[in-house]
Regions:
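Conserved structural motif at the start of ABC-family nucleotide-binding domains
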Residues: 2, 17-18
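The feature captures the beta-strand-to-loop junction immediately N-terminal to the Walker
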Residues: 33-35
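Conserved ABC transporter NBD signature motif
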Residues: 56-64, 73
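Conserved ABC ATPase "signature" region
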Residues: 97, 111-128, 153, 158
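Walker B catalytic motif
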Residues: 132, 161-162
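Conserved ABC ATPase signature
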Residues: 132-136, 140
Length: 168
């Protein structure tokens, strides 16, 4: 379970999040709904430890994330931000393989490649997996990033506006 206890965050003098507490159960879908600027992205970034909270505590499976090692945390929780820009010449397959970094530190095993293949298949990217990211439509690129997060195989996946650029 992810537990957020009395968390606050401010930028300068502006409080973005004030005294927020929430429980996110493992295996459940939880959605944060609110207007632009309500702090949803900031909360997800604090839960994933991309940014530090000013007050309160965040726990994943009863472990305070401030005390978690990066490698261990990356095996428990993954995040897809609402805008992702990697300015490298990568194929979809190479991008998705980044999801396995917490397990292999860039030296992928046969098991890692199985996770990559499964994520590519799940997101219906098999036919274009060798295309470069800069050759893709916005929707194809978004599906590739989602596949990367799936390949990370964490217990919790945080998706910040995951339907951006996807045709529905």
């Amino acid at each position: 379970m992810v537990m957020v206890k009395s968390v606050s965050k401010k930028y300068g003098e502006k409080k973005v999040i004030e005294n927020v507490s929430v429980k996110i159960e493992k295996g459940k879908i939880t959605s944060f709904i609110g207007p632009n600027g309500a702090g949803k992205s900031t909360l997800l970034s604090m839960i994933s430890r991309l940014i530090e909270n000013d007050e309160g505590d965040i726990y994943i499976d009863n472990q305070n994330i401030k005390k978690s090692k990066n490698n261990q945390l990356a095996k428990k929780i993954s995040i897809l931000k609402q805008s992702n820009n990697i300015n490298l010449k990568l194929t979809i397959r190479e991008l998705v393989s980044f999801g396995r970094f917490p397990y292999s530190q860039g030296r992928l095993t046969e098991e890692d490649w199985e996770y990559v293949d499964e994520a590519i298949r799940y997101m219906d990217l098999e036919d274009i997996q060798h295309k470069f990211l800069d050759e893709l439509s916005g929707g194809q690129r978004q599906r590739a990033y989602i596949a990367m997060v799936i390949a990370q195989d964490t217990e919790y996946i945080l998706l910040d506006e995951p339907l951006n650029n996807l045709d529905m």
